[in-house]
Amino acid sequence: MKIEKIYPKGFAANTYFVTADGKNAVVVDPAQPRIFSLLAERALAPAYVLLTHAHFDHVGGVSALQRAGAKVLCSEEEARLIGTQADLCEEFGAPPSDFHSDETFSDGETKSLCGLKVTAISTPG
């Protein structure tokens, strides 16, 4: 398994690429659209996007990854918030969210993604 922290420009979110096979990636909190090109530079295909939360500064690259075939996963609570922050986006000059959640997960639930076992741990607050 390889985990790479990506340092975006502008809004600083903790974006990560995680891969078990060196070909398919799970992307955590893709803050910016350029995340798609950074994956391509590493010859990684975006298979899944995991969102820790749906604030605009963590989801800027989700639309591009979803259009490329990545499945978007987040908690049920965050799935309800997707697309509801247009005024906050406008205030910070960020485009509004244009994606949807493909799957949701619950606290403590484990999923297998690209050969990786991922367990959700809720940390509200």
Q: What does each model-identified segment do?
A:
Residues 28, 52, 121:
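Active-site flanking residues adjacent to catalytic metal/cofactor-binding acidic residues
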Residues 12, 32-114:
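Active-site HxH/HxHxD metal-binding segment of metal-dependent hydrolases
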Residues 2-3, 17-19, 108-125:
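Core dinuclear metal-dependent hydrolase active-site scaffold
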Residues 24-26, 48, 116:
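Structural motif
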Residues 6-8, 94, 100-102, 121-124:
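Short Gly/Pro-enriched turn/cap motifs at secondary-structure boundaries
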Residues 1-44:
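Conserved beta-strand hairpin/beta-sheet module of binuclear metal-dependent hydrolase folds
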